[in-house]
């Protein structure tokens, strides 16, 4: 289960700025884990685009589980 602060990777292109394979951090979980607010970052650690994007669970994969 993907939760806040976990690191994810997209498994498809989200928009013109967020390509397949882009990494991000989960900021918020919506609708019992069906949607997520993600801060996406580039290879330099810089925020991509407007800083946040809402994505569907099917469009992301868990990369790093952050222990609480």
Task: Please place each PLM-identified region on the residue numbering.
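Basic/aromatic-rich interaction segments and small domains that mediate binding to polyanionic partners
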Residues: 3-62
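Long, low-complexity intrinsically disordered regions
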Residues: 63-68
């Amino acid at each position: 289960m993907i939760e806040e602060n976990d690191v994810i990777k997209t498994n498809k292109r989200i928009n013109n700025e967020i390509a397949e394979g882009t990494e991000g951090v989960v900021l918020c979980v919506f609708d019992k884990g069906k949607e997520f607010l993600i801060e996406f970052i580039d290879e330099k650690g810089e925020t991509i685009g407007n800083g946040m994007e809402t994505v569907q669970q099917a469009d992301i994969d868990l990369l790093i589980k952050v222990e609480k």
